[in-house]
């Protein structure tokens, strides 16, 4: 029903990516509304040539028209022509906000290329965009810009849900806990106690805020 957008793509196959994204986004939006989830993954390398993960997050106020995209590119193998991979990724960045109805300046992109030192830690040259998201009645803090990961692994949602269902009356030990989201689910599920352990004080402080 809205205005028609024309996006000039660099690779002809990018039209297939757009069609796939449109289909999966429609399904996931329905699912998110039904489950009461405000952040969710709409695409995860569904097409091998477009190896990106695209997540939808709410902005401040959780308004429908105030959405943000977090797009993470999986580093292409050395057998792929770097120029072709870059053109595909440029097409993803151009098409995704149009297909999903998100403002271009609300798109944050990263490349998932782990350094030996652990590039999940904060790059001091990056700014932050911190907001809160809702999952199963709990609020979690996420940073869409400052780190490689946002603070909440969306593909672990079912595991967190399972923890919450089985936690009642138990003592819950969360090792390599990251930002402690599983501990929140355990506490909410009636755990007798929770212990949250991580090597990073930054993430432990984040877990405490959650």
Regions found by a protein language model. Give the residues of each.
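Non-catalytic accessory regions of SAM-dependent methyltransferases
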Residues: 1-70
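Residues at the N-termini of beta-strands
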Residues: 39, 104-106, 193
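A short interface-forming secondary-structure element
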Residues: 67-84
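Conserved alpha-helix/loop element of class I SAM-dependent methyltransferases that forms part
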Residues: 154-170
């Amino acid at each position: 029903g809205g205005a028609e957008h024309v996006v000039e793509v660099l690779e002809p196959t990018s039209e297939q990516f757009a069609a796939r994204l449109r289909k999966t986004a429609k399904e996931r939006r329905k699912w998110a509304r039904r489950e009461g989830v405000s952040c969710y993954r709409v695409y995860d390398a569904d097409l091998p040539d477009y190896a990106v993960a695209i997540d939808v997050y709410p902005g401040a106020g959780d308004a429908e028209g105030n959405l943000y995209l977090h797009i993470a590119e999986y580093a292409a193998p050395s057998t792929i022509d770097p120029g072709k991979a870059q053109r595909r990724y440029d097409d993803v960045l151009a098409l995704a906000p149009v297909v999903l109805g998100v403002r271009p300046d609300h798109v944050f992109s990263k490349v998932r290329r782990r350094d030996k030192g652990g590039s999940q830690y904060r790059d001091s040259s990056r700014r932050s965009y911190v907001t809160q998201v809702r999952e199963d009645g709990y609020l979690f803090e996420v940073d869409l810009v400052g780190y490689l990961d946002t603070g909440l692994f969306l593909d672990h949602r079912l595991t967190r849900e399972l923890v919450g269902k089985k936690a009642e009356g138990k003592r819950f030990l969360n090792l390599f806990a990251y930002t402690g989201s599983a501990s929140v689910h355990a506490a909410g599920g009636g755990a007798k106690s929770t212990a949250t352990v991580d090597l990073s004080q930054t993430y432990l402080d984040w877990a405490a805020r959650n």
